[in-house]
Amino acid sequence: MGGSDSDSRSRSRNREENKSRSLSSSSARRPSPNHEKKHEHSSEKKKMKRRRSSSSSSSSSSPSPSREKKAKKKKKRREAKKLKREKKKEKKEKKRQKKLALKAERAAALTASVPAPVPEEKPQTYLKTWQSEETKEHGPAMTDEQKAKLSTRRPLTKEEYEARQSVIRRVLDPETGRTRLIRGDGEILEEIVSKERHKDINKQSTRGDGDAFQKRLGISR
């Protein structure tokens, strides 16, 4: 009887130990309520963050109506400024064109009112008239044959030219009193004379030049 009681006691102890072990293991496996609360709180935070990020991304992707209004206002202001600048430019251009037109009209009126200056014909001085007359050639009078040949403009033959050039004439200028040797149609030759004859010729020529000049000026000795 004593052995059976001891066996039953040992068995009951073993059972109790097994139960306590199983309870401790189950309690160890089960998370504590504080830990569960923390886990739930962190999961809620994560969810909130996700929602915020999604809302911020959606707000950034789709512009808000206030921003759109501001952008429209800025656009309108820019357009208004551009229009003002263009109007100012147009006004300036119109003013410039008006000024140019007025200047042109004034210039035209001045030119029309002021007559063009008529150049006055100055009477020629005696010196000029004398010089112009001096330039004229007072050569010998041409014969009818020479005039006819000049009018026909026929080229001379060699014989005709030599025959004409062989003729030497002494021609007197009635105004100056000078005598010249002329060969052919008008080639003036220099006459070789003595010193005394040369002096006489110079005296006569100076006298004749003085008389001719006084006649042109209208002065008489």
Swiss-Prot record:
It holds the Pfam family SR-25. Its main location: nucleus. The keyword Nucleus applies. One of its GO terms (biological process) is mRNA processing. Residues 1-20, 33-45, 131-148, 196-214 have a biased composition (Basic and acidic residues). Belongs to the ARL6IP4 family. One of its GO terms (cellular component) is nuclear speck. Residues 69-101 have a biased composition (Basic residues). It is found in: Nucleus, Nucleolus; Nucleus speckle. Residues 1-162, 196-221 are annotated as: Disordered. May be involved in modulating alternative pre-mRNA splicing. This is ADP-ribosylation factor-like protein 6-interacting protein 4. The gene is arl6ip4. It comes from Danio rerio (Zebrafish).
